[in-house]
Amino acid sequence: MDMLGLILAGVIVYEGCWQLSEHRERKQVYNHARAVADFNNASLLVIGCPKWGLWHGHGDYTLDLIHDPRWCVCPNPITGDIRDVDKMFMWKSVVVFSSHVLEHLTPSEGQEALNALSKIELAAYHVWPNKKTISGWVSPWHKSWPSVDNDGDIIFEARSRQ
């Protein structure tokens, strides 16, 4: 195998390991959110449609910007913007699980979404791509890097496109 082939194989293995790690994290966090919702006799709101059903389960309600039946075959689909979630769920408190959603928002949009969620959530669990993944960097739809600060708050770092 020539040098280019070795480099390509290394990149594929590197990204594959990260994707498996993220898959495991999504499953674990989703299962925890589901258990918290069940324990509290609350609805689970999944934000970010589980595309093709591979990454995590559905919620009692599932919110996505676009309802595409090829991707999102779930009970109670809701098409809408995460920043308006407090207007959609005024009548109840929910446990929130969002998967690979927050990075699609600018820092100001992300803060707006978290503020809306804080009005309806009993508990919230969020996952997003790791900053070390290649797919996280090359996605043209990612607008920020969410992370957790020392106080446990979610913060957003603007993406630079250089």
Question: What is the meaning of each model-derived region?
Answer:
Residues 67-69, 82-87, 100, 118-120, ...:
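Short, surface-exposed linear patches
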